């Protein structure tokens, strides 16, 4: 029978079993290696309130903390929420990650400061 994908839609190679995780969206059980993972870094405070909080802060150079979340989606939720989309037979073989989204007016990120 023909195969749709070289990796059968998952990252399990020599392992017999992979522990299941729950989809963030619908709570369906999905094998951890098959789940579509999305790492999100957001400010805890929404963009509209950042200036108000920084002005009200006692500390002048206080950096607002960020929220680091790894979202796990089942295949159907990832397609529905447009995290991934179905691709043609030839495009499926392309393993390069999609280009990183940067807003048009954003400056390139400065290099990290040495400690």
UniProtKB/Swiss-Prot annotation:
<dbReference type="InterPro" id="IPR038551">
    <property type="entry name" value="Ribosomal_eS26_sf"/>
</dbReference>
<dbReference type="GO" id="GO:0002181">
    <property type="term" value="P:cytoplasmic translation"/>
</dbReference>
<dbReference type="GO" id="GO:0022627">
    <property type="term" value="C:cytosolic small ribosomal subunit"/>
</dbReference>
<keyword id="KW-0689">Ribosomal protein</keyword>
<keyword id="KW-0597">Phosphoprotein</keyword>
<keyword id="KW-0963">Cytoplasm</keyword>
<dbReference type="InterPro" id="IPR047864">
    <property type="entry name" value="Ribosomal_eS26_CS"/>
</dbReference>
<comment type="function">
    <text>Component of the small ribosomal subunit. The ribosome is a large ribonucleoprotein complex responsible for the synthesis of proteins in the cell.</text>
</comment>
<feature type="compositionally biased region" description="Basic and acidic residues">
    <location>
        <begin position="87"/>
        <end position="97"/>
    </location>
</feature>
<dbReference type="InterPro" id="IPR000892">
    <property type="entry name" value="Ribosomal_eS26"/>
</dbReference>
<comment type="subunit">
    <text>Component of the 40S small ribosomal subunit.</text>
</comment>
<dbReference type="GO" id="GO:0005840">
    <property type="term" value="C:ribosome"/>
</dbReference>
<dbReference type="GO" id="GO:0098556">
    <property type="term" value="C:cytoplasmic side of rough endoplasmic reticulum membrane"/>
</dbReference>
<dbReference type="GO" id="GO:0003735">
    <property type="term" value="F:structural constituent of ribosome"/>
</dbReference>
<keyword id="KW-0256">Endoplasmic reticulum</keyword>
<feature type="region of interest" description="Disordered">
    <location>
        <begin position="85"/>
        <end position="115"/>
    </location>
</feature>
<protein>
    <recommendedName>
        <fullName>Small ribosomal subunit protein eS26</fullName>
    </recommendedName>
</protein>
<comment type="similarity">
    <text>Belongs to the eukaryotic ribosomal protein eS26 family.</text>
</comment>
<dbReference type="GO" id="GO:0003729">
    <property type="term" value="F:mRNA binding"/>
</dbReference>
<dbReference type="Pfam" id="PF01283">
    <property type="entry name" value="Ribosomal_S26e"/>
</dbReference>
<keyword id="KW-0687">Ribonucleoprotein</keyword>
<feature type="modified residue" description="Phosphoserine">
    <location>
        <position position="54"/>
    </location>
</feature>
């Amino acid at each position: 029978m023909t195969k749709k994908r070289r990796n059968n839609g998952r990252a399990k190679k020599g392992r017999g079993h992979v522990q299941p995780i729950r989809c963030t969206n619908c709570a369906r059980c999905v094998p951890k290696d098959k789940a579509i993972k999305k790492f999100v870094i957001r400010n805890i405070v929404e963009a509209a309130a950042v200036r108000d909080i920084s002005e009200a802060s006692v500390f002048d150079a206080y950096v607002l903390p960020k929220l680091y979340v790894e979202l796990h989606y089942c295949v159907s939720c990832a397609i529905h929420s447009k995290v991934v989309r179905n691709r043609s037979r030839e495009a499926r073989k392309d393993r390069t990650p999609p280009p990183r989204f940067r807003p048009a007016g954003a400056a390139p990120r400065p290099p990290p400061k040495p400690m």
